[in-house]
């Protein structure tokens, strides 16, 4: 009997590597790109649902950043937008190291030559000139080509008595082009002043993010300034300001809702309503139907 107490128990033997391989084999095969996570609420969203909802989170209403191509699709009448100066590209004016590689990488990623798309299109048959900045191209930074294209479309609008819409999305002036990028602020503002002298309408639509030299110039010069919800709008970064003034800023600081409260913008418009809202403004300002 005592002998039986000291007998070794019999255990089943498990091969961990065999078990692991079995688990891996049994994982469901989910195609990549089918789901995406909201950066605001961490909700997992079925990509098709996100696309059908104009790239707005179905849970918290966070507006995802979108490309100029998608913006054109949402705002303009089908097949009416005609892009202008598509082939313009930078030539690295100050020979900044690795700049060409970064430009080439952005061109490959986005399929665009630069960080802004300019052209003319129609909203319910009302013709407008438009510039749409691309945050996916070097964070929409403003260099010589971005400045030139926006200036040209503003001048085109002035010559043809058209209203101008600018959808801003930018990290500011492009450091790789030095003083040449900063010059674009004054250049675009001067073109907009000539547009204003003719009594023509300029509408700015601030989208996430709108910062730096773009905010300090043409983004805040619109006759009417609109914004998408929860858009980051500012000049210097939050940490820079806090370190400078030695104070903690409010959580809502530099958000479009904060700017609306302080009177810096006129209205916050959800993406699903933007096309209709712009149409109403154009009608109220006497914009004529396309002929």
From Swiss-Prot:
Residues 34-291 form the CoA carboxyltransferase N-terminal domain. Binds 1 zinc ion per subunit. Keywords: ATP-binding, Cytoplasm, Fatty acid biosynthesis, Fatty acid metabolism, Lipid biosynthesis, Lipid metabolism, Metal-binding, Nucleotide-binding, Transferase, Zinc, Zinc-finger. It is found in: Cytoplasm. Its EC number is 2.1.3.15. PROSITE patterns: COA_CT_NTER. Zn(2+) binds at residues 38, 41, 57, 60. GO terms for molecular function: acetyl-CoA carboxylase activity; ATP binding; carboxyl- or carbamoyltransferase activity; zinc ion binding. Disulfide bonds: none annotated. The keyword ATP-binding applies. SUPFAM superfamilies: ClpP/crotonase. Component of the acetyl coenzyme A carboxylase (ACC) complex. Biotin carboxylase (BC) catalyzes the carboxylation of biotin on its carrier protein (BCCP) and then the CO(2) group is transferred by the transcarboxylase to acetyl-CoA to form malonyl-CoA. NCBIfam families: accD (TIGR00515). PANTHER family: ACETYL-COENZYME A CARBOXYLASE CARBOXYL TRANSFERASE SUBUNIT BETA, CHLOROPLASTIC. Belongs to the AccD/PCCB family. This is Acetyl-coenzyme A carboxylase carboxyl transferase subunit beta. The gene is accD.
């Amino acid at each position: 009997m005592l002998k039986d107490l000291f007998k070794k128990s019999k255990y089943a033997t498990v091969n961990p590597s065999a078990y692991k391989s079995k688990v891996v084999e049994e994982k469901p095969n989910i195609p990549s790109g089918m789901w995406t996570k909201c950066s605001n609420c961490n909700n997992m969203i079925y990509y098709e649902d996100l696309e059908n909802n104009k790239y707005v989170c179905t849970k918290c209403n966070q507006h995802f950043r979108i490309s100029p191509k998608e913006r054109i699709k949402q705002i303009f009448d089908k097949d009416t937008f005609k892009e202008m100066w598509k082939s313009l590209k930078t030539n690295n004016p100050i020979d900044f190291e690795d700049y060409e590689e970064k430009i080439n990488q952005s061109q490959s990623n986005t399929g665009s030559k630069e960080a802004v798309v300019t052209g003319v299109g129609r909203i319910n048959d009302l013709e407008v000139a438009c510039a749409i900045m691309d945050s996916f191209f070097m964070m929409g930074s403003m260099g010589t080509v971005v400045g030139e294209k926006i200036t040209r479309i503003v001048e085109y609008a002035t010559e043809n008595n058209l209203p101008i819409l600018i959808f801003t999305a930018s990290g500011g002036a492009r450091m790789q082009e030095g003083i040449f990028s900063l010059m674009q602020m004054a250049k675009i503002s001067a073109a907009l002043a000539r547009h204003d002298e003719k009594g023509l309408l300029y509408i700015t639509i601030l989208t996430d993010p709108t910062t730096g030299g773009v905010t300090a110039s043409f983004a805040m010069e619109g006759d009417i300034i609109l914004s998408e919800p929860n858009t980051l709008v500012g000049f210097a970064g939050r940490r820079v300001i806090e370190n400078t003034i030695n104070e903690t800023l409010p959580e809502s600081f530099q958000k479009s809702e904060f700017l609306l409260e302080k009177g810096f913008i006129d209205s916050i418009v959800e993406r699903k309503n933007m096309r209709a809202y712009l149409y109403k403004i154009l009608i109220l300002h006497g914009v004529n139907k396309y002929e």
